[in-house]
């Protein structure tokens, strides 16, 4: 009960200020794989908390929580959060391909050290986790056709590896064929719209290019500019809640310069992946391009495009 109350303090306004779903509507839960770079920024912690809150309300079935970041503290932090929300057995995985991004927190307070040091988890370091590619292929092969939503709030490294994978013990299909058969859509916190440079794109430019050009299903982008103006966490750190890794991550970092709240880049993608973009956002169809080796992206509107990007709903 306390966890639910404290999550309401962090997210209630964020997920309800633009509209409410009727209590009589009971859609099937979304089958979700979350792919995160948790570590460079702590908004991933809030995004995972939002995901777990929606799982507790029956709106999402969390199939896996994967790391796109090689940093050794990512998987322990993911497991801390899964365990805190009473889901310690959610499969995890980490990238094994090289080269890949390995990025620690850029905040002075090393919250990625504090969480594993103070809360239970199974895996000592990220490199001990199963191969994210194998986890993807195993889970996708077991799901009904067009039933899985993938939400990436990190780099595209794992998704590139998935697209370029071949048949294995889990499926005779290539990675691209497996995605086309099993995935309903990809929702990604990536890009700056209509053009610019954004962290999740430029940290692994080759992977971003592959996914932008070859992904066979619908992609919905929640760009940097969306979450950049949505601040969360202020009420959370003021609540009388103890022994919460979510509150700890926010409280540790707030002291460094976020007194009014932290930007919610990753929350927006999780929200769209689970609840859809309406009534929170409008979308425009088009094509997404990574136009240079520095990771600059642009967007070309096209009513027949299979990619969408979100913009605030009036």
Regions found by a protein language model. Give the residues of each.
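Alpha-helical substrate-recognition element adjacent to the catalytic core
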Residues: 80-83, 314
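Bacterial Sec-dependent N-terminal signal peptides
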Residues: 1-27
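Short, structured active-site "lid" loops
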Residues: 83-89
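Surface-exposed loop and adjacent secondary-structure segments within mature catalytic domains
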Residues: 90-119
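Active-site histidine-anchored catalytic micro-motif
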Residues: 27-79, 121-229
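Short acidic, glycine/serine/threonine-rich loops at helix termini
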Residues: 103-106, 162-164, 233-234
